[in-house]
Amino acid sequence: MAVLPVVPGEQSFALGIYLLSFWHYCLYWMAFAFGVQSFGTFKRGAVIAKTVSVAALAIVYLRAPIDFASLAVIAAGILLNVRAAAVLGFDRTYYGHEVAGLPLRRVAVFPYSLTAHPMILGNVAAFGGTLINDAFRAQWWPLASLHVALNIGLLVMELAGTGRRRAVRIGGGVVLAGTLFAAVLAGLGTS
């Protein structure tokens, strides 16, 4: 019996990138909509899933020629995220109030002095910043656009709050199912 070597093609590479890219949004939604058994386990899973997602995006972004304007916007978004997370602390960054029952705490230090949702704005800037790079955008615009759309979805979820869990469960489920469908189509359609 002969064993044929499997050489992954560009289409299966793209499908893999898309399928690795969105799991952290699912974890956020599930925790927000249904709660968690262990906050520590949720945080670890969320960090691992987001790390895989960002690594997948970085792999394809770094294959494109350097675009300094794009890199500047990405860096600004990441710096906004880092500053916001540092101000909130690790537990509150991962829905500590909503999921783990940490007491409500109003934060008025930059960047929260300017906006209530700087991490989402930082994510939108960073993911949107990739689209400034023409070469990246030509092939991977659905990937970055889905990230931007899902971050806006997270904002809607956060604004709805835990008091509207049924709406969050239904709406989030529909959005995530649509995202999975769109990711598979985009991954299969990439040549």
Question: What is each PLM-predicted segment?
Answer:
Residues 1-112, 121-191:
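Membrane-anchoring alpha-helices and their flanking helix-loop junctions
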